[in-house]
From Swiss-Prot:
Known partners and oligomeric status: Interacts with NCS6 and URM1. May act by forming a heterodimer with NCS6.
Gene: NCS2
Keyword Chloroplast in record: no
Pathway(s) the chain acts in: tRNA modification; 5-methoxycarbonylmethyl-2-thiouridine-tRNA biosynthesis
Organism in which the protein naturally occurs: Saccharomyces cerevisiae (strain YJM789) (Baker's yeast)
Residues carrying Phosphoserine: S489
Major place of residence: cytoplasm
GO terms for MF: nucleotidyltransferase activity; sulfurtransferase activity; tRNA binding
Protein keywords: Cytoplasm, Phosphoprotein, tRNA processing
Official protein name in the record: Cytoplasmic tRNA 2-thiolation protein 2
GO cellular component: cytosol
Protein task: Plays a central role in 2-thiolation of mcm(5)S(2)U at tRNA wobble positions of tRNA(Lys), tRNA(Glu) and tRNA(Gln). May act by forming a heterodimer with NCS6 that ligates sulfur from thiocarboxylated URM1 onto the uridine of tRNAs at wobble position. Prior mcm(5) tRNA modification by the elongator complex is required for 2-thiolation. May also be involved in protein urmylation.
Biological process, per Gene Ontology: protein urmylation; tRNA thio-modification; tRNA wobble position uridine thiolation; tRNA wobble uridine modification
Pfam (any one): CTU2
Subcellular location: Cytoplasm
Length: 493
């Protein structure tokens, strides 16, 4: 088989087959790179961010771009590789000048910190050092996921009244004696893997957005493929967060954080690419070596003709053990080679959505996920739900009720009622308007009501956070990054 994009006089052997077209390695790399660069130049705002602007002395001629890099995600790594090639081209064409600089941000946990250090050192040496010898184009930052809790001066305890779904909260100051950790939150409050996955995703996204807000970036480049975006869209619908889809995909408006306008826009440069195409690019460019899950990456579906791989049956989870995100991921991974039009249809349809009209008296954002709230979910749930129990009457019912009270479930409910009464009493005595007017989006309310132990959750107050306080490397040479990398975990350097 020959490449269909090479010139007729010199066709190379085809190595990739995607969208019913055959490519050689070189043509496929160009195909993927062109798709990404097209998105980076999608409108005037982004064109001005990424192109080289003359004169160089003009204020704002060099844009600041934040690129969140996950070393377990092929999309963000491929995106970084293509951005690196673009910057290299600009230095050659414009006398060592570039139109933008890139700050790479990696969020790490205690479990993967050592391997992240190792992979980042290799990535820096191979992909970033060359450009930084010319100019300070790349900066690398690391944030411990626990900084989400460490850098908040106040936390709120949210609890749901199961009689009317009203949300109450109690705020308290944080000091060294009561600092929370991700491990504690997930272990103490989450009842299933879906709730753990949701909270981890929210925390990482908020860390990245806070970092962008506090450091004045012009754009955040997310490495989501068309497949990944479709997965997120369906997951949002399933979780009761469908109203967030339009805001999530919005690349035209500036973002908001805690009802404050930000100076950056969100961009998805990989949104025209399927995940199998990204995995194929990763293999061709030999980028898998930089990921922390190399073995898992090597068996992911791709569109390479000679090296197609599928996960073995022994590695597949049972559906009942999967999170919502994993179920949607499996569905789209299974269909993308043969029915990629379904994926593109999901994304095209979602792109046409607009934000719902708000019925709120004033703009409000969810205190957990920071999404916009358009209607009060507590009122709606209270109207459609019967929550009053049938009274205990017979001797048998009283006996069974007593048994339930003595069980772990009954004791847990007793603890919930005591905590609810305590927080409600505190809320009635509080003069804090925010505490008396707490709002959660429908999705987070359902999460709290069904997947969080005792229907209560301790969460940092967003307006008291300072993410940059402990982010490593602020304008340091790349050669010094790893030496200055502070690990916020016991037993690690």
């Amino acid at each position: 088989m020959e490449c269909q994009r090479c010139s007729a006089s010199a066709r190379n052997p085809a190595t990739v087959e995607s969208r019913k077209e055959k490519f050689c390695d070189e043509c496929f790399i160009k195909f993927v790179s062109t798709k990404q660069r097209k998105q980076m130049m999608k409108d005037e705002y982004f064109r001005n961010l990424f192109k080289v602007i003359y004169p160089f002395e003009k204020e704002g001629s060099v844009s600041k771009i934040l690129l969140p890099l996950s070393l377990s995600d092929s999309g963000s790594l491929v995106m970084l590789d293509i951005v690196h090639d673009l910057l290299l081209e600009q230095t050659k064409q414009h006398n060592n000048r570039t139109g933008f600089t890139v700050d790479v941000l990696t969020v790490f946990t205690e479990e993967n910190v050592s391997v992240i250090k190792e992979r980042m050192e290799s990535l820096i040496n191979e992909k970033m050092s060359q450009l930084n010898k010319i100019s300070n184009i790349f900066n690398v930052h690391f944030i411990d996921v626990n900084e989400f809790f460490n850098n908040a001066s106040e936390v709120s305890t949210f609890i749901i009244d199961n009689e009317n779904f009203e949300i109450f909260s109690k705020s308290k100051s944080v000091d060294d004696s009561n600092i929370l950790t991700l491990k504690e939150i997930l272990g103490k409050y989450c009842l299933n893997s879906s709730s753990r996955s949701d909270l981890i995703s929210i925390i990482k996204t908020q860390l990245i957005k806070h970092f962008a807000y506090e450091n004045g970036y012009n754009a955040i480049m997310w490495g989501h493929s068309m497949t990944k975006l479709s997965e997120v869209i369906i997951s949002l619908v399933v979780k009761g967060k469908g109203s967030q889809i339009a805001t999530f995909l919005d690349s035209e408006s500036f973002d908001t954080l805690n009802n404050k306008p930000c100076k950056y826009k969100n961009l998805y440069p990989m949104k025209d690419l399927l995940s199998v195409e990204i995995e194929s690019f990763l293999q061709i460019r030999n980028l898998a070596q930089f990921l922390i899950n190399v073995e898992e990456t090597n068996v992911k579906p791709n569109c390479l003709i000679a090296r197609k791989s599928l996960p073995s049956l022994g590695q597949q989870k049972l559906v009942k053990n999967m999170t919502i995100n994993e179920i949607t991921n499996k569905y789209f991974q299974d269909i993308q080679n043969d029915y990629s039009n379904i994926i593109s249809t999901v994304l095209r349809t979602a792109d046409k959505l607009t934000q719902p009209k708000s019925s709120m008296a004033k703009p409000s954002q969810c205190q957990i996920c920071q999404s916009k709230i358009y209607t009060n979910p507590s009122n709606w749930l209270n109207r459609i739900t019967v929550t009053s129990p049938y009274p205990v009457e017979t001797t048998e019912e009283k006996y069974l009720f007593k048994q339930w009270q003595d069980s772990k479930l009954g004791q847990s409910h007793t603890h919930y009622v005591e905590l609810l009464n305590e927080i409600k009493q505190g809320a009635s005595n509080s003069l804090d308007v925010e505490d008396s007017d707490v709002k959660l989006c429908y999705g987070c309310l359902i999460l709290l009501n069904t997947s969080i132990k005792d229907k209560n959750l301790v969460w940092p107050k967003v307006d008291t956070m300072d993410i940059t306080a402990n982010a490593t490397n602020k304008n340091k040479e790349l050669s010094q990054i790893l030496d200055q990398f502070e690990i916020n975990s016991d037993g690690e350097e």
